[in-house]
Curated annotation (Swiss-Prot):
Stretch forming the signal peptide: 1-27
Domain of life: Eukaryota
Species name: Arabidopsis thaliana (Mouse-ear cress)
Gene Ontology biological process terms from the UniProt entry: defense response to fungus; killing of cells of another organism
GO cellular component labels: extracellular region
Disulfide bonds: C33-C69, C37-C57, C43-C67, C47-C68
Protein name (Swiss-Prot/TrEMBL): Defensin-like protein 81
Annotated family: Belongs to the DEFL family.
Record keywords, A-Z: Antimicrobial, Disulfide bond, Fungicide, Plant defense, Secreted, Signal
Tagged with keyword Secreted: yes
Location relative to the cell: Secreted
Amino acid sequence: MTIKKFLPLLLSSLMVYSLILLPIISGKSPVSCDGACTSTPQCNKICTSKGYKKGICHGSAHLFYICCCYAKFESQYDPSISSPPNY
């Protein structure tokens, strides 16, 4: 009787765990940080021109600022998805 109640809980827990773990394993990230910046508006211009949703200039403790671009949607990071041809 206990096994019948435990199996659905175990199965649903494994499904949730795998849905959380899959993007981590595949290396997909909702943020792309590269390049130096001096201000958030400058970083935002660079990121939006590249097709990202927004950009934020993050500073570290060593006075080094890096521009981080945030994706509009997750499929933007999937290299296997190509753009449709322009006819």
